[in-house]
Amino acid sequence: KHFPQGTAAPETAVPAVPELPDAADLPAFSIDDAETSEIDDALSVQDLPGGGKRVGIHIAVPTLAIAENSPIETIIKQRQSTAYYPGGKITMLPDNWIQTFSLDEGKRPVLSLYVEVGEDFQVASTPQTRLENLTIKHNLRIQDIEPHFNADTGLSENEPVQFPCQPQLRWLYRFAVERQKQRDRYEENRTPQYDYG
């Protein structure tokens, strides 16, 4: 009775996305649960010539195609967000919009934020943002990588690589640990945190 017209958002035509420059060839990847159908963010880690890394955070941008007072804007105002419940969800966007803008493997429009990080794990540049087309190389799934990348295994460079982008994840893990240490927030033997969401 709460959804007399059903829970699916009505299919609405997706306008042409504005022309965007192509990003550099980056090893961009996403990490999500196996059930995730709306992949809205991705990461990249690129080696810099003088040492250090350039870290990219890439966000899906369906707003590129949302015009004021358009049918899709009306749907979004009605729904406001994706609603999650145990065992399922009601998406804010229609399926054809999700398929167009989800960061599945392949070339996708994104809003990217780039920052350079030195070998000492200090942020070495002012963040830069760009609207661009980025080729997502890998959609990693937590259930697939967790057995090979956790507190007990997979973090050392001396261990074999078990899945795509594991070297980049190892570096991001070290970066996170070093930043926590620099902020006096690192807990080596932290009590496990559980997410029941």
Region annotations inferred by a language model:
Residues 1-3:
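Boundary/activation segment at the start of structured domains
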Residues 9-197:
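Electropositive polyanion-binding surfaces
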